[in-house]
Amino acid sequence: LKLQSAKTANLEIQNSLGEAQDRINSMALLHQLLYRNNQMTSLLFNEYLESLINQISGSFSLTKKNITVESHLIELELDLDTAIPLGLITNELMSNAYKHAFNGKEGIIKVELSKLVKNTYQLKVSDNGQGLAADFDLTSSDSLGLDIVAILSEQINAELKIYNDNGAHFEIVFKVG
């Protein structure tokens, strides 16, 4: 994909190939962790998430130097059927924040993984950027990334909450077990 991107002068194609490459890298990272730990059915999601956050931040570090990422993650073991979609969701939401939230200004992206009640957890990705449009509606959005977030949330029977509060906030509430 990187070679294909370098061979085209079309910026839109380059961006699409870059986004596809980020999604593939998200999956590759997960598989590296599985093989390294000799686990094939579950993994410590917080470790994967921390590695994924670093990978995504690294891919934007040359062009978005003024953006800081903070993470607050509890330890949580997840099966692959839940970990893979949540990893892809994180990739999409962080990438969207890097690309659209700050318009060249300084900013903070936060990724939080927390326990709400007994077997219910929350993954939250937020930023302190310009926020979503006042009339934002996910059902009429033309963002492929947010469509992917909605589809993957539905796939794991998670509740997706989107709102503005000094920036864009995305909460994915999911059950384990």
Which role does the model predict for each range below?
Residues L43, S61-M94, Y98-I108:
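Conserved short strand/loop->alpha-helix "switch" segment adjacent to the catalytic nucleotide/phosphoryl-transfer site
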Residues I156-Y163:
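Glycine-rich ATP-binding loops of the HATPase_c
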Residues E106-N119:
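Short beta-strand/loop element within the Bergerat-fold HATPase_c
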Residues I172-G177:
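C-terminal beta-strand of the catalytic ATP-binding
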Residues T120-L146:
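Glycine-rich/acidic phosphate-handling loop/turn and adjacent ATP-lid/helix
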Residues L1-L29, L34-L43, E47:
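Histidine phosphotransfer helical core of two-component systems
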Residues I108, G131, D165-E171:
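Glycine-rich nucleotide-binding loop
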